[in-house]
Amino acid sequence: IPMWQSALILLLISAFFTMAGGLKAVAYTNVFQMLLLIFVSATLTIAGLYKVGGVSALAEAVPADYWNLFRPNDDPAFPWLPIILGYPIMGVWFWCTDQSMVQPVLAAKNLKEGQMGANFTGWLKILDVPLYILPGIICLALYPGLKNPDEAYMTMVTNLFPVGMVGLVLAVLTAALISTVGSALNALSTVFTMRSEERRVGK
């Protein structure tokens, strides 16, 4: 299936369940795909570490600078100064002002539940390193000849997982994509309603 047709189908599916269920449907989908994505990513990390021979073998198989977060300021990819100055701004913009992130918190039943949800999300971000960053480093150790880094995740999935698990991963990634698009559509509809339709009807 061509890429544009796949994107169109996923967009239509996302639009359908968003219009039918609203923010509640988006929230349930987010929880569902979160649990599955954590399970799949944790399984992939464990399988990758087992294949490469453990943490010690992984540390020896990749360059030492892969474990250094603060690189020289003349580093072409990750200079420390732009990262320290730029990432907090990007983080505040996305997590604190983006409508698709803010709207679920504002839709909480009360202030306490909204605070608990935001706090829980912050703790989940700790899992990014073992679940999403570490598999990329493991892939470098296992498949150093891989030319396209965008294919790292699925390369590990197809080589380390049985056929049934590969199907589950595809379903999880599809659910995550639909969830992201659904959140964006729901946020867009809210902004459009508040900024355009509400003013027009009010007049």
Named regions from a protein language model:
Residues 35-167:
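Loop-to-helix junctions at membrane interfaces in multi-pass transport proteins
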Residues 12-16, 85-92, 161, 171-181:
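Hydrophobic alpha-helical transmembrane segments of multi-pass membrane proteins
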Residues 198-203:
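Conserved small/polar residues in nucleotide/adenosyl-binding loops
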Residues 7-11, 30, 40, 118, ...:
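Residue-level recognition of transmembrane alpha-helices
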Residues 30, 34, 118-126, 172-176, ...:
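Transmembrane helix-bundle signature of multi-pass membrane transporters/permeases
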Residues 5, 24-25, 113-116, 167, ...:
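Residue-level recognition of membrane-helix boundary sites in multi-pass small-molecule transporters
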Residues 165-196:
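Membrane-helix boundary/coupling elements in multi-pass transport proteins
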Residues 1-25, 40:
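Transmembrane alpha-helical segments of multi-pass small-molecule transport proteins
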